[in-house]
Amino acid sequence: MQKIVLLVLSSLLVFNSFAQEISKEKEKQMQWFEDAKLGIFIHWGIYSVNGIDESWSFFNDYISHEDYMKQLDGFTASNYNAAEWAKLIAGSGAKYSVITTKHHDGVALWDTKCNDLSVVKKSPAGRDLIEPFVKELRKNDVKVGLYYSLLDWSHPDYPNETRKIKRYTDDSERWNRFVDFNFCQLEELSKQFKPDLYWFDGDWEQSAEKWKAKELAESLRGWNKNVILNSRIQGYGDYATPEQGLPITRPDNRYWELCMTMNDSWGYQHNDHNYKTPNQVIRILIDCINKGGNLLLDIGPKADGTIPAEQVTILKELGRWTNKHAEAIYGTRSGIPFEHYYGPTALNKKGDILYLYVPHKPNGPLVLKGIKNKINRMWVVGNGTKLNWDVKMKQYWSAVPGIVYIDVPEKVLDEQVTVIAILLDGKVDLYREKGQVIESN
């Protein structure tokens, strides 16, 4: 009996040790992503010709599939300049970029050999549009992400054609051909471009078993050991991907990313002028940073490959702000609870520098509460101006920290969002109790 107990204990120790090693390996693999904070999403495809919803327009019967595909004839990419795109993206402060290699319409933007439906073979663009972009991103030290739709409403072996029409309901031979097709395209992308990240979409229509999600994830990591996968592969991904709506509380997954459009459309739509302001975009980025996540901000180029002027303006102002405040963005971790400061915050990795984001012109001193640490220094991020502070309500007999009042001169304010850095005497130590009554004087 004693031998059995020892054997079980030793097996548990080995298992725990193995699990810890896997956890450390995952942490190391995900570090660049957790540090990045900002990525740029690109939805580019034939839907930009008419300026209609990508893929969904024919799936929802707003336009026939035949008329949707006629857009291939107008997709020229005649002014596409991958170097300019990459330079603009790097200049925005983004550390990675994700481009649609194929949306739900099945039209590939690279020279796939797995079928004939690509802009290379079927449109005036007539060339691989992914290859030059990947090269230019790497020249600019920007990580490469590839978007890939698992479902394909144009493929003859995919079950669903539109919301109302199915090609078939149960045909294992056709389904297996389609799964093989997905594996074929993803092997091409993996071996040709060696992406740092895959951004899957469309997994909701089938189960993990039908997609062969486990085998697919293993294959992708076999072709490219360190590739990161998003969550949309039926539970086999590395990070969560809330969409459009800003999370009010932090997602459960340690690693997460909000994907969001600049206006109301993923792809280029000439009638959509409802753009967010640079200030709104910056504040959403800050909210993501505050909760320990990333922002993947979308742009939608035109059919000729030019990026709309409104989108360029937003990216450039975003770049000005991120460049100025880099220390309070990249490599930071989630901030302190709102009870301590009425605004978003972040911490450096060591946890001894607290960043306060100031989105408005203060009408008095900033207020910081419940910090048990000694404050060594305060400064304005981006210009280095040292700040004065005052502590009130600190009693010698009480463990409750005093309230810190911080004076921020108007001359140091950024036109979008100001950031204050506070150097503490060690890792941030928060008072989270309910106050104290005097017992002795």
What are these regions (language model features)?
Residues M1-I22:
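Bacterial Sec-dependent N-terminal signal peptides
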Residues Q20-N441:
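Mature catalytic domains of secreted/periplasmic carbohydrate-active enzymes
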